[in-house]
Design a protein with these regions (language model features):
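Hydrophobic, regular-secondary-structure patches
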Residues: 3-85, 205, 211-213
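A short beta-strand structural signal in non-transmembrane regions
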Residues: 24, 172-204, 213-214
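A short acidic, helix-capping loop that chelates divalent metal ions and anchors anionic groups
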Residues: 34-38, 145-147, 224-226
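Structural beta->alpha junctions
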Residues: 40, 142-144, 188-196, 219-222
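Hydrophobic secondary-structure segments that place a key small or acidic residue at a functional site
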Residues: 69-72, 77-92, 97-171
Length: 248
């Protein structure tokens, strides 16, 4: 039992580490905890600043690659046992999601299409019913054991359509004026020789306002999580061994 648990936890952690291909995430003020939760198993969230800020952030020294993502939390839907996290990304600049989905899907993600996580119930006709609309699903990903299993991925051009659809059937997920320019995070891969913390300081020096932005270091989250899980598994193995001996 302990061995199987270890394998399952390690599989989940490996999936998470592959997903966290960025060294640094820049997020809006007061949203660091929400962003960290999205990287593990937290609740779906909606938060954003605007594309002009994202464009400025990308000008900092020490950045090898940068890409934007937009997060939308849906209401409970027929397709899902839990709230759905909608993740908008830019396939042209992305280096985080594409490598992770490459084994399941090849080709461009067209406007209006979705890639679904493992726990999302896709209809027999290959669609998901969300906000009163049927969205075509081009691929469904393997189980990761993380919150990504309750997520769907869309391209950034589809985000305004999603916002408009939400307004027709429920509370609008964000103001219409922001639908085409909302960015939840800038995912950054640093240049060789640059620490993520150094790049964060470079970003802050670009504009005094950027000192108030949130800075998340995904590598630290996975390292801490793996350490905690290793300790948990050790305790569980001891517990299972004691129970087994007592049973004998």
């Amino acid at each position: 039992g302990g061995t199987m648990l270890t394998m399952n936890l390690n599989t989940g952690m490996t999936s998470m580490e592959k997903r966290l291909g960025a060294d640094l995430m820049v997020v809006p003020q007061n949203t660091v905890q929400k962003a960290e939760a999205l990287l593990t198993n937290g609740n779906p969230s909606t938060f954003y600043f605007t594309k002009d800020i994202a464009d400025e952030v990308m000008q900092a020294d020490g950045i090898a690659q940068a890409t934007e993502q937009t997060y939308i939390s849906s209401l409970a839907a027929a397709c899902c046992a839990e709230k759905l996290q909608i993740i908008g990304y830019d396939p042209d600049t992305d280096f985080v999601i594409e490598p992770w989905v490459a084994s399941q899907f090849e080709g461009p993600l067209e406007d209006g299409q979705m890639i679904a996580g493992a726990n999302v119930n896709v209809s027999t006709d290959g669609t998901i019913e969300l906000y009163g609309r049927s969205w075509p699903v081009v691929a469904q990903l393997a189980n990761t054991g993380t919150s990504l299993d309750n997520s769907v991925f869309i391209n950034q051009n589809t985000v305004p359509d999603m916002v408009a659809a939400s307004a027709k059937v429920s509370k609008q997920v964000m103001s219409a004026e922001y639908a085409g320019k909302a960015v939840s995070t800038v995912m950054i891969k640093t240049q060789q020789g640059y620490e993520a913390q150094t790049v964060a300081e470079n970003i802050k020096r670009l504009d005094s306002r950027f000192a108030d932005l949130g800075y998340v270091y995904p590598g630290g989250i996975t390292a801490n999580t793996r350490t905690s899980l290793t300790a948990l598994v050790t305790y569980l193995k001891i517990f299972v061994a004691v129970i087994w001996v007592m049973g004998v």
